[in-house]
């Protein structure tokens, strides 16, 4: 694309030997669609926003993890106190003898699955390593780049150990109620979600859980679920031949008219308009 914004290495790395650095987004503002001369890992710490990656929308919040390749195009919109960190790296500059392809989805042709989640335990461990990595990447001593790369290796191994598919928190997990709730919501795209039943199963207070969720994500539980469903609907409208009424059902709306009302309110256009516009841009 002729007018595509490209983020350049020279604007983020101190020299041509530096392989890894950290870019803080405290908070992440609206950011136009762009690609990069480098790759990045994106860790979301709190708040929420709309992350559009290669034309697929994701409603992101605390614990979301993305593996972004240089050629991927993405943007951030509808942000609300969104706090994240970008760990950016140049694959060709990495010197450490590590099987990076096994650790990083999409690394130099490896199988790519961009979106994962981290629970509280994984987030805490990753944050500690990222803090050290940020310190070293800003260092000026002769071993700073080597130390930063060692820490990057530790980070990608930590992420591989703790990451899980967005709708598949391991049954043996010791993660928090909030992590379990977000996974349960991801499993409720097509069917109603009963918070009271979830709280009864987990033996927790519904009121306290609602407060915790809003404090960490900046949204109510219902708002989050609705927006996740709308993101899924946007994807299906663009990439599937399903009728709008069928997409409505697959996104948890039994009434297609109500689905159209909610979709229009959230996106500013009807499902038909969205599909038409998306097909034109393909």
Curated annotation (Swiss-Prot):
One of the record's GO molecular function terms: DNA-binding transcription factor activity
- Report the principal subcellular site: cytoplasm
Q: Which domain of life is it from?
A: Bacteria
Query: Which sections of the sequence are annotated for DNA binding?
Result: 196-217, 244-267
Where is the site described as Interaction with sigma-70 found in this chain? 246
Q: Which PROSITE patterns match?
A: HTH_ARAC_FAMILY_1, HTH_ARAC_FAMILY_2
Is the keyword Transcription in the record? yes
Question: Where does it live in the cell?
Answer: Cytoplasm
Q: Which Pfam families match?
A: AraC_binding, HTH_18
Which InterPro entries does the annotation name? AraC-bd, Homeodomain-like_sf, HTH_AraC, HTH_AraC-typ_CS, RhaR_RhaS-like_N, RmlC-like_jellyroll, RmlC_Cupin_sf, Tscrpt_act_RhaR
Q: Lyase: is it a keyword of this entry?
A: no
Name the GO cellular-component terms: cytoplasm
Q: Which GO terms describe its biological process?
A: positive regulation of DNA-templated transcription; rhamnose metabolic process
Tell me which residues make up the HTH araC/xylS-type domain: 179-277
Q: Which keywords accompany this UniProt record?
A: Activator, Cytoplasm, DNA-binding, Repeat, Rhamnose metabolism, Transcription, Transcription regulation
Oligomeric and partner information: Binds DNA as a dimer.
Recorded hits in PANTHER family, A to Z, give: ARAC-FAMILY TRANSCRIPTIONAL REGULATOR, HTH-TYPE TRANSCRIPTIONAL ACTIVATOR RHAR
Role description = Activates expression of the rhaSR operon in response to L-rhamnose.
The name this protein carries in UniProt is: HTH-type transcriptional activator RhaR
Instruction: State the species of origin.
Output: Salmonella arizonae (strain ATCC BAA-731 / CDC346-86 / RSK2980)
For this protein's source organism, the top of the classification is: Bacteria, Pseudomonadati, Pseudomonadota, Gammaproteobacteria, Enterobacterales
């Amino acid at each position: 694309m002729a007018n595509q914004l490209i983020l350049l290495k020279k604007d983020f790395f101190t020299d041509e030997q530096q392989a890894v650095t950290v870019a803080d987004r405290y908070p992440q503002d609206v950011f136009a669609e762009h690609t990069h001369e480098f790759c990045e890992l994106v860790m979301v710490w709190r708040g929420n926003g709309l992350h559009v990656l290669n034309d697929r929308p994701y409603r992101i919040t605390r614990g979301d993890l993305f593996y972004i390749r240089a050629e991927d195009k993405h943007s951030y919109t509808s942000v609300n106190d969104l706090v994240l960190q970008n760990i950016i790296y140049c694959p060709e500059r990495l010197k450490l003898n590590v099987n990076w392809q096994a650790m990083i989805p999409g690394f130099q042709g490896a199988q790519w699955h961009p979106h994962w989640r981290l629970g509280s335990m994984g987030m805490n461990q990753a944050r500690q390593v990222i803090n050290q990595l940020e310190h070293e990447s800003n260092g000026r001593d002769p071993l700073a780049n080597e130390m930063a790369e060692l820490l990057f290796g530790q980070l990608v191994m930590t992420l591989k150990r703790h990451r899980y598919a967005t709708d598949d928190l391991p049954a043996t997990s010791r993660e928090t109620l909030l992590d379990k709730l977000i996974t349960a919501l991801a499993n409720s795209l097509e069917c109603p979600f009963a918070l009271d039943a979830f709280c009864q199963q987990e033996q927790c207070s519904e009121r306290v859980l609602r407060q915790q969720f809003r404090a960490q994500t900046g949204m109510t539980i219902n708002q989050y679920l609705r927006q996740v469903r709308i993101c899924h609907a946007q994807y299906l409208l663009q990439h599937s031949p399903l009728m709008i009424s069928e997409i409505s059902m697959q996104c948890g709306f039994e009434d297609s008219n109500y689905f159209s009302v909610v979709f229009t309110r959230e996106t500013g256009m009807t499902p038909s308009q969205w599909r038409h516009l998306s097909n034109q841009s393909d």
